[in-house]
Amino acid sequence: MTQDEASAFCEWLSAMTGHYYRLPTEAEWEYACRAHRESEYHFDKTESIDVFAWHRFTSNGSAHMVKGKKPNRWKLYDMLGNVAEWTIDDYATRGYDDHNTKNPKILLEADAPAVIRGGSWKKHPSALRCGAREAMDPRWEEYDQPQERERHSESVGFRVVRPYLMPVTEQERVSFWSHRSPEQ
């Protein structure tokens, strides 16, 4: 699953339902993952990550069906582990340190890698934290033929958001599903 394929699904879902859906920004993803907690994890220190996340030591080497582990406090499943998740943002090394922190969406140059969040079943449990972030592997976007499985990642997926504010102008509608602005 590439970021472009995930965005295309959001656009298709929007057309089918008449409601707008898109990939979350990094900030939206982290807010949903933390579920009003300030700690590294969305669960108490007395609980084991094993009951919340599929990771290197619990996954048996593959992703699993959603809801196989406990959800966070907002009943969102698999926010950590199982598959990492696409966001609409570009990867900035310092995250939001150099960018707007109110309703942020980080867009850099056209060839900037996108951000994935949440970690996957391949990761060590210590890497599965609410604030952990990674840049995508460029090979995931460079496939020529769909059968080239090594060009896709079996450990990256996506979840959708249905934002409260809908796109109004034509420019907003054009850029709604893409991590690129129409000028790029």
What are these regions (language model features)?
Residues 34, 43, 54:
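Phosphate-coordinating loops and pocket residues in cytosolic domains that bind phosphorylated ligands
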Residues 37-38, 62, 83-184:
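Surface-exposed recognition segments
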Residues 1-37, 57-77:
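Short aromatic-cysteine micro-motif
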Residues 45-50:
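Short, surface-exposed glycine/acidic/tryptophan-bearing loops
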Residues 26-27, 42-44:
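Short, surface-exposed recognition loops or helix-turn segments adjacent to catalytic cores
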